[in-house]
């Protein structure tokens, strides 16, 4: 009997311990969600009442002199800035000596950006949004109503022949068309001395030339004799249909015209 009791005791001692029951599925899912939030650095979203209490507590911590969009530097100055609601862009408004001045700057910027939807620090002292958005107009002194109307009215001038009816082509065709235009060549008027029948001597007297004198500048015309040696005047006059009319005989009988002889 003693041996049998010992065998039973050994069997009881070698039996595996019982496992604890698994936790419910809802508690495990909540725990995993909480761990994921802690890993990402997110905080649980409070309800409306909790959010209002949190904002009130933060406002109480900042003190009675704290305003929206205003914070104090360590050396005592106050700075003001504003963020755009949708874009998140921050606009720097400046540094001020007091918190009230910084708050007023924030109110002005918020009213210009958000309009009537802006939440202001001093709603009773803020200017209307229309006055902020509209630019200041400085009227010049001593301006009569007629002068002001003439200056503000746009100047409308219509060039003759540039009306819409003149610009639009008939039948909807093109206004500007390409056309062959021949150049107009006007004959040059002859000097009055040649028109009166005067010759080279008359021209010399008119221009105060000393024709018989030995004028050094007249030597420049000697190069015409060398040039005339290489010109075929008959061929040029035949191709160009040139006619020498109403010229004095002394001019026509120059070395340039007698090369073919």
Swiss-Prot record:
**Record function comment:** Probable transcriptional activator that binds to the DNA sequence 5'-[AG]CCGAC-3' of the cis-acting dehydration-responsive element (DRE).
Which key words tag this protein in UniProt? Activator, DNA-binding, Nucleus, Stress response, Transcription, Transcription regulation
Q: Which family does it belong to?
A: Belongs to the AP2/ERF transcription factor family. ERF subfamily.
Q: What is its main location?
A: nucleus
Q: What is this protein called?
A: Dehydration-responsive element-binding protein 2D
| Cited PANTHER family | DEHYDRATION-RESPONSIVE ELEMENT-BINDING PROTEIN 2C, DEHYDRATION-RESPONSIVE ELEMENT-BINDING PROTEIN 2D
Q: Which Pfam families match?
A: AP2 (PF00847)
- Lineage top rank: taxon: Eukaryota
Q: Could you tell me which residues form the DNA-binding region? A: 66-123
Query: Which InterPro entries does this one have?
Result: AP2/ERF_dom, AP2/ERF_dom_sf, DNA-bd_dom_sf
Q: Where in the cell is it found?
A: Nucleus
Which GO terms of the cellular component aspect does the record hold? nucleus
Q: Which Gene3D superfamilies does the UniProt entry name for this protein?
A: AP2/ERF domain
**A GO biological process held by the record:** response to stress
Q: Where is this region: Disordered?
A: 1-72
Cross-referenced PROSITE patterns, in alphabetical order? AP2_ERF
According to the UniProt entry, its GO molecular function terms are: DNA-binding transcription factor activity; transcription cis-regulatory region binding
**Organism lineage:** Eukaryota, Viridiplantae, Streptophyta, Embryophyta, Tracheophyta
């Amino acid at each position: 009997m003693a041996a049998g009791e010992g065998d039973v005791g050994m069997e009881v001692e070698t039996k595996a311990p019982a496992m604890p029951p698994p936790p419910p599925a809802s508690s495990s899912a909540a725990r995993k969600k909480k761990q994921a939030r802690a890993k990402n650095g997110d905080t649980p979203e409070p309800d409306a009442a909790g959010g209002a209490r949190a904002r009130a507590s933060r406002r109480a911590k900042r003190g009675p002199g704290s305003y929206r969009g205003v914070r104090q530097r360590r050396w005592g100055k106050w700075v003001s800035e504003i963020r755009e609601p949708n874009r998140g862009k921050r606009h720097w408004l400046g540094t001020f000596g007091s918190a009230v001045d910084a708050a007023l700057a924030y109110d002005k910027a918020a009213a210009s950006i958000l309009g009537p939807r802006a939440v202001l620090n001093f709603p009773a002292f803020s200017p209307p949004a229309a006055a902020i958005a509209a630019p200041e107009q400085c009227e010049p002194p001593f301006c009569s109503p007629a002068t002001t109307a003439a200056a503000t009215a746009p100047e409308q001038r219509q060039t003759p022949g540039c009306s819409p009816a003149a610009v639009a082509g008939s039948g909807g065709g093109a206004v500007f068309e390409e056309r062959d235009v021949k150049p107009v060549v006007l004959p040059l008027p002859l000097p009055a001395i040649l028109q009166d029948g005067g010759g080279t001597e008359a021209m010399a007297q008119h221009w105060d030339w000393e024709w018989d004198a030995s004028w050094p500048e007249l030597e420049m015309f000697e190069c015409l004799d060398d040039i005339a040696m290489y010109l075929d005047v008959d061929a040029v006059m035949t191709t160009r249909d040139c006619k020498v009319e109403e010229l004095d005989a002394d001019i026509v009988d120059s070395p340039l015209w007698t090369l073919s002889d």
